[in-house]
């Protein structure tokens, strides 16, 4: 399954992606944190691919709240409402395999769980490589950052009025920090921010944006 996915654009630098992966406590991110695809290996990659081809469809888990990678088009309904660069990649994989694509929307933490348990075949949801994930999942090569070092490609979101007072992690000692639960950014908070007033986990990035916008997070 992973080989089939890799042949359909996962390693191309022009394909869009982002990164919000699941991490475990104490895990250290490697230099490769570019976005990619993860595939279930609970029944073996070759067996899983054969199952997909025999049944005629592939089930892909995603959290559709991370534009421009995956989001909902309010002018459409049903599965056609799901759009974004990762969704287009999912469709391309389906076309390459000659099977129907069935997107399975869910919250982010459930995306990874659905792969480790073998519930769904593939996850495309702005994911990144971590050593712990590589132990239980098949991962594609990153396809978002290209030649850019992914470790230098991340930043923090602050309100416009706070731009002059928050310029680095060292300025967050008396601030409320927000990150998505189970994300690589959550790991960065734990590993790289020396001090902060409070840390809030959110289930989606949209919730995080809203907290910063309304002053509930900095």
Regions found by a protein language model. Give the residues of each.
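Bacterial signal peptide processing site
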Residues: 11-14
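C-terminal motif of bacterial Sec signal peptides marking the signal peptidase cleavage site
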Residues: 6-9
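Acidic, polar ligand-binding/catalytic clefts
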Residues: 95, 100-171
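Sec-dependent N-terminal signal peptides
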Residues: 1-3
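Bilobed "Venus flytrap"/periplasmic-binding protein-like clamshell domains
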Residues: 59, 64-67, 79-95, 127, ...
